[in-house]
A protein has these predicted regions:
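A short, exposed loop/beta-hairpin motif centered on an aromatic-Gly-Thr core
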Residues: 28-39
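Generic alpha-helical hydrophobic packing signal
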Residues: 22-24, 31, 51
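Short, charged, surface-exposed hinge/linker loops at domain edges
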Residues: 1-9, 38, 42-94
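Short aromatic-glycine-(Arg/Gly/Cys) micro-motifs in beta-strand/loop hairpins
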Residues: 8-27
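Generic secondary-structure boundary/loop-capping signal
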Residues: 27-28, 62
């Protein structure tokens, strides 16, 4: 079976945890970390690539992408259109 290249977009959240930077690929829910923001981004790109390759090898790529909110279009898979990313604070009696 011939292989084809998959081009997919995702939004990256980046934050610091102690001395590490964490990168999170939304909406795929894949995360990685590094000592610098650039290192975390590169590690995340590698992790996303491995995640998608594994899903392809298992025959579950379509389901994984649909579950993450992607839609199959004429030009390939299109991710959700973000309308905002917000930070909220909530006080809870515990």
């Amino acid at each position: 079976m011939p292989q084809s290249n998959l081009k997919i977009d995702y939004t990256v959240q980046l934050w610091r945890e102690g001395r590490q930077y964490v990168a999170h690929a939304m909406p795929l829910d894949v995360m990685s970390a590094g000592n610098t923001p650039d290192e975390a981004r590169r590690a995340l790109d590698e992790a996303v690539g491995l995640f998608l390759k594994t899903a392809t090898d298992m025959g579950t790529l379509d389901q994984v992408l649909e579950d993450a909110g992607y839609a199959l279009c004429e030009d390939g898979w299109e991710g959700p259109a973000w309308v905002g990313v917000e930070r909220h604070t909530l006080s809870v009696v515990a």
